[in-house]
């Protein structure tokens, strides 16, 4: 790596408000890879995108604030290359600068990126000697900087991508049983493929959140004005039938916390007591008790989706108890724990508990597609 030019694909798609970064998680996660390459005296050329400029230059989506943040964190000068990539013909242009860390301007300013254009990828590959993908969260996209560049250069995974794939393998292929999945979210249709793929490998699948309301209603109970998805009985039947065949237990709430509105006071109810003007906003104490016992008896746990409307502290108790129980087992080295999904990560951030899990994925779509058993273009390209 010494003095080699490393094309490093990162996901620096951080939330920006008026040129200010509001959450630096994605930047913090890739610092080990950057520091490793700096230590090896490599020249680093970073490729990333922010937002959806759709192949046009959008000033508000420049990587300039990200360069400034990287500069602060690395304590090193970081140069933003604003030149049109398509007009840079050779890698020697990097030698004109003294810096060791370069960032090419938003790769999605070029329509060729999302079109997975082979010629565009070849042009970019001319700038480097080696390609490294440390953007697991973008690896479900067949885009030029993810899928095509590896055709032109020796290509490797970055440290963060490696961690992510190894952690996900421990819940999909190299499993220590008993293994439990706690899965939530508002729509079954967005998680059906994950559930179907996991049933044959898992001992327990615990359904919480808005999705659980469909199960509660399917088994003959009133869910009032609760959030639920329409027309999904067929999906439920499919889940129930596969789980029986594969001897995987499907668990849904036995009691619930309801209120008349999102800001109302919480009330604990049995499933047959929910009134038509009430909404289910969390799991009840009996359900919490059941879930914590299952966690105690598990060796591996995957958590994707809070148990209730955790944004209101009145309805966050179920999710907090799940988090506490997983952390307790983690600290005692009794469990391997993986969590992922925007709301789950947000909840763990609120509890300052992100580092209390073996692995917390911030990868969103790529995380779910991996759990669905799909091949991710970025991983396929590296293989």
Regions found by a protein language model. Give the residues of each.
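Active-site loop-to-helix "anion-binding N-cap" substructures in soluble metabolic enzymes
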Residues: 1-383
